[in-house]
Curated annotation (Swiss-Prot):
Allows the formation of correctly charged Gln-tRNA(Gln) through the transamidation of misacylated Glu-tRNA(Gln) in the mitochondria. The reaction takes place in the presence of glutamine and ATP through an activated gamma-phospho-Glu-tRNA(Gln). The keyword Protein biosynthesis applies. Its EC number is 6.3.5.-. InterPro entries: Asp/Glu-ADT_sf_sub_c, GatC. Subunit of the heterotrimeric GatCAB amidotransferase (AdT) complex, composed of A, B and C subunits. One of its GO terms (biological process) is regulation of translational fidelity. This is Glutamyl-tRNA(Gln) amidotransferase subunit C-4, mitochondrial. It is found in: Mitochondrion. Keywords: ATP-binding, Ligase, Mitochondrion, Nucleotide-binding, Protein biosynthesis, Transit peptide. It comes from Culex quinquefasciatus (Southern house mosquito). Residues 1-23 form a transit peptide. Residues 51-73 are annotated as: Disordered. It catalyses: L-glutamyl-tRNA(Gln) + L-glutamine + ATP + H2O = L-glutaminyl-tRNA(Gln) + L-glutamate + ADP + phosphate + H(+).
Length: 172
């Protein structure tokens, strides 16, 4: 990755030609990012034309801490069922803890009141998005698509052979 020093970054109104010219006139030491801290310019984020869309303060949770459910244990039989359905290995104690944490988090989300909240079309609903125009075609690209598959059978994709089989012996 090439890091461009701040003083060489393109500013509004600066052409590519002038940027290349100033880039070519710099010393290799300037491009390595080994400048002293005293010569670096500090960025004032409040003066940027497009400041970050990431909130500066965390969102206060509406989840009541007292109404959160206790830890929901996952027994061995449910663990095996989830392993088989999700094709994820849950052998370790850490995997079981992660699964229980995920279930606890999901149950907290269920307690959030969303009655008067209007659904979003997208997270960036207020942003102007340029979408491509839909073009209807008859397709006929089946062979092109199937070339991407590692294994095919009768003009269909085949799931990876490393998957966990559906029938399993119960663990001891």
């Amino acid at each position: 990755m090439i890091r461009i020093p701040f003083h060489l970054r393109q500013t509004p109104g600066r052409t590519l030609h002038s940027l290349v010219r100033s880039f070519a006139s710099t010393k290799p030491a300037d491009l390595s990012g080994t400048q002293e801290k005293s010569t670096r310019q500090k960025i004032n984020f409040h003066e940027l034309k497009h400041p970050s869309k990431v909130p500066q303060r965390p969102h206060k949770s509406t989840i009541d801490g007292q109404s959160t459910p206790t830890r929901i244990p996952v027994d061995a039989q449910k663990g095996q069922l989830l392993e088989r359905l999700s094709l994820v290995d849950l052998d370790s104690a850490e995997a079981h803890r992660t699964l229980e944490d995920a279930i606890e988090f999901a149950s907290q989300i269920l307690s959030v009141d969303t009655d008067d909240v209007e659904p979003l079309y997208t997270v960036l609903e207020r942003e102007r998005l340029t979408l491509r125009e839909d073009r209807v075609s008859d397709g006929n690209i089946q062979q092109d698509v199937l070339r991407n598959a590692r294994v095919t059978e009768e003009e269909n994709f085949v799931a990876p052979p490393e998957n966990i089989p559906l029938e399993q012996e119960p663990r001891k």
